Amino acid sequence: MQRKPFILKTIMAVAACKAVRAFLRRSGRGGGTALPGKVARKFSKQVLETTSEGMDIIVVTGTNGKTTTANMLETALTESGKDVLANKSGANLLSGVTAEFACAADFLGRPKKKCAVIECDEGALKQVVPEIHPKVILVTNLFRDQLDRYGEVMNTLKQIRTGVEKDPEAVLVLNADDSLVSSLGLHTPNRKVWFGLDMPVGDQSPRVISDALHCIRCGAEYQYHYYTYAHLGSFYCPKCGYSRVKPDFAVEKIDRMDADGSSVTFRIGSETRNVTVGLPAVYNLYNAAGAIAAYAAFGGKADDICRSLSTVHSSFGRMEKFDLPAATSKERAQQGAAASETAGTVPVRMILVKNPAGCSQTIDYLSRIDGDFRLVICLNDRTADGHDISWIWDADYERLSENTHIQSITVSGDRAEDLRVRLKYAGVNEKKVTMEKDNEKLLASMREGSLPVFVMPNYTSMLALRKILSDATGKKEFWEKQV
């Protein structure tokens, strides 16, 4: 007798979720990524557990790289013939995860797909894990992020640890080079799989303030055999002996790294192989290493994901490319520019930045670009971004002043003035810097000239700019690609 009300609640929750999402998308009010899940949970608190029951699930969490790593895993699983559920938009709170599973279920709330790759917010992990019972939990890294929401990084670590403890059966895939993430392997019964970089990268005198300067066990200052970036690297504590674990999956050598990707020598256990990663920058090597490790822990063949990494595409504002139509001769003449230039396309690359470590790594990536380009930096301080923007003073904007390929910098967003001040103190030539807060005018300025444009937005500014760039280039929204 108790089963009927439960089934009825599930049916109503799923129906409401699907209806709200359909309405939002058809009315042009967004992708329906979170609100449908909130509505569904009003009808049934068990709707997520019901609609995910029996599925094999990988959960990806951590400060940076969640969306990209999840995309790598989804691509590999799809290419291996599996029908995969994924929260492609990055809606990674409990409501967003609920919406994905409920909308993918049949009208009785039964899952129609066998497996899922879900990125999960660090703070939501403790809510999501006990409801979906993942087979694998991958933790990418831990950095300061949204200080007014999470507080300092140790609080974020505590929240992730609480989430991990909710499922002792899940395999933990951990970044061996991150002393904070690595500590999740202490005193947990879960099986652990480790990934990392077995080599130094870049400047061995880090220019970014460390988020993990002291040993998490005894408080002594860490020493390093080498750094990769920020506080990541081969760390060890000279006092208590806490140190980096030798990873099971690791990049041993970078054979090539350019603006479009990397070729590396990758170690899996005791064997090595050549792997091409179709996304650039050092942090994407970590994302790739984590994806390979998680794929193997999930039961997949490492060779399969190693092959798919060469063709993986950028996702939703993370190294995403747009071919923006250049201004026509008529438009240029109206704006007082030379009308003789041939209209074509302007390459635009969008790179989401939201904390000091990610921002500094993006600036490092820009230092590797051959040829001149224009730069746009956007900063909002809305709820989804975090209202505290003090982190921009810890990012390595000073390197922008050293980059002779940057021909102009446009600052935009709610806190554009703060960016302009930060660039001034970073030593950037003030004549190169302009401010444009109107997104339509910003788009028009991008279309002028032929130099490539790199855009560094934080989260809400990325959503706004991505929409106008998608409209201007005819790019479909993420849900329009789904069947």
What are these regions (language model features)?
Residues 4-196, 204-214:
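Phosphate-binding loop of NTP-binding sites
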Residues 73, 77, 97-101, 288-298, ...:
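Buried hydrophobic packing segments
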Residues 83-88, 274-282, 348-349:
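A short glycine/serine-rich beta->alpha loop
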Residues 119, 140, 173, 287, ...:
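Residue-level signal for inorganic ion chemistry
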Residues 120-145, 184-274, 325-326:
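Extended acidic/charged loop-beta regions that coordinate divalent cations
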